[in-house]
Swiss-Prot record:
Keywords: Disulfide bond, Ion channel impairing toxin, Knottin, Neurotoxin, Secreted, Toxin, Voltage-gated sodium channel impairing toxin
UniProt superkingdom: Eukaryota
Description of its domains: The presence of a 'disulfide through disulfide knot' structurally defines this protein as a knottin.
Protein name according to UniProt: U5-ctenitoxin-Co1a
Protein family per UniProt: Belongs to the neurotoxin 03 (Tx2) family. 06 subfamily.
Entry-linked InterPro entries: CNTX
Claim: Magnesium is one of the keywords in the record: no
Record keyword Secreted present: yes
Name of a matching Pfam family: D_CNTX
Cellular location(s): Secreted
Annotated S-S bridges: 4-18, 11-24, 17-32, 26-30
Species this chain originates from: Ctenus ornatus
Gene Ontology CC: extracellular region
One function term, GO molecular function aspect: toxin activity
């Protein structure tokens, strides 16, 4: 799982992409993917 910038908790199991606001993204374009 990834922990996006500004987030205290890791993303959900299948939501490991980070969006432009640091939110977890499950589908669609991803700005970054962090381990």
């Amino acid at each position: 799982t990834a922990t996006c910038a500004g987030q205290d908790k890791p993303c959900q199991k299948h939501c490991d992409c980070c969006g432009p606001k640091g939110e977890c993204v499950c589908e669609g374009p991803c700005i970054c993917r962090q381990g």
